[in-house]
């Protein structure tokens, strides 16, 4: 009498995943542009924040200088000196003097991290100081 086979005998089992070789490299190549885009957006956001902060620093230094009678004409140079080099080169200063106050508005052009795009607008900050 023949005994029932519990297991079927076959040759070696085919290798599972043999056709999946290199799939992770293809997936990585597909996601890489998205990762680069997110990284560039984060860097651009940091540049915007830095430009705004530098505009405020330049405005305060320029207003402080313009508030003194003897150094009033040097306000733009002192404002640029308080800023980093690359933001100082992109900065414009506007002075509006009232009776007892001096107000300086600094405008900085925000650069783009994408080559050839130009600028992404401007960041402006103002500072008011009492006259001495």
Regions found by a protein language model. Give the residues of each.
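Short, conserved structural patches
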Residues: 2-9, 68, 72-132
């Amino acid at each position: 009498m023949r005994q029932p086979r519990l297991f079927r005998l076959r040759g070696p089992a085919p290798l599972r995943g043999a056709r999946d070789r290199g799939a992770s490299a293809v997936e990585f190549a597909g996601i890489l542009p998205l990762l680069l885009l997110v990284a560039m957006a984060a860097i651009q956001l940091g540049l915007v924040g830095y430009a705004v902060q530098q505009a405020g620093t330049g405005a305060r230094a320029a207003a402080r200088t313009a508030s003194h009678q003897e150094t009033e004409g040097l306000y733009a140079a002192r404002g640029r000196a308080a800023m980093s080099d690359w933001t100082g080169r992109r900065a414009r200063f506007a002075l509006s003097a009232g009776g007892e106050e001096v107000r300086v508005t600094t405008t900085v052009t925000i650069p783009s991290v994408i080559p050839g795009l130009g600028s992404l607008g401007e960041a402006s900050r103002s500072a008011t100081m009492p006259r001495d």
